């Protein structure tokens, strides 16, 4: 499973969701020639979820591109070291994500997710504990 789908899912962000996003783009943030991918500007014009890999060094440019498209209040999440014990997550909007990155000291390796689906995030903290509790409640009702 690609990290572009698995890492957002691991913190409860779906890449598509009815009434939020019908599709998604997966884009490399930095090309072989160390420039920002031109596809980011195209993706910023769409309503799709945008997943950017290797984009932290271009975050300021990404923010500018989305802001230029009138999307400064669009939700964005950055997941550093996704699915690992040292995972860090920053969630905000295009307009404030750079200050969140600074505050949380986010850096590479990280995945950037942009779009309404970030607001659909399901809190998966303690999911196993909650599942166990639900199973216990079911057993009590059955008894």
Spans of features found by a protein language model:
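A contiguous loop/helix-start segment that scaffolds small-molecule binding in enzyme catalytic cores
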Residues: 21-23, 32-143
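Short glycine-cluster motifs
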Residues: 1-30
């Amino acid at each position: 499973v690609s990290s572009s789908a698995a890492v957002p899912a691991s913190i409860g962000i779906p890449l598509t969701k009815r009434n939020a996003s019908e599709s998604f783009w997966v884009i490399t943030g930095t090309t072989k020639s160390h420039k920002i991918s031109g596809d980011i500007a195209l993706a910023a014009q769409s309503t799709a979820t945008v997943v950017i890999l290797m984009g932290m060094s271009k975050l300021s440019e990404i923010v500018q591109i989305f802001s230029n498209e009138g999307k400064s209040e669009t939700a964005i999440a950055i997941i550093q070291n996704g699915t690992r014990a040292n995972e860090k997550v920053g969630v905000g909007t295009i307009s404030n994500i750079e200050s969140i990155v600074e505050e949380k000291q986010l850096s590479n390796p990280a995945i950037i997710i942009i779009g309404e689906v970030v607001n659909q995030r399901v809190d998966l903290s303690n999911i196993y504990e909650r599942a166990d509790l639900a199973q216990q409640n079911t057993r009590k009702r059955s008894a």
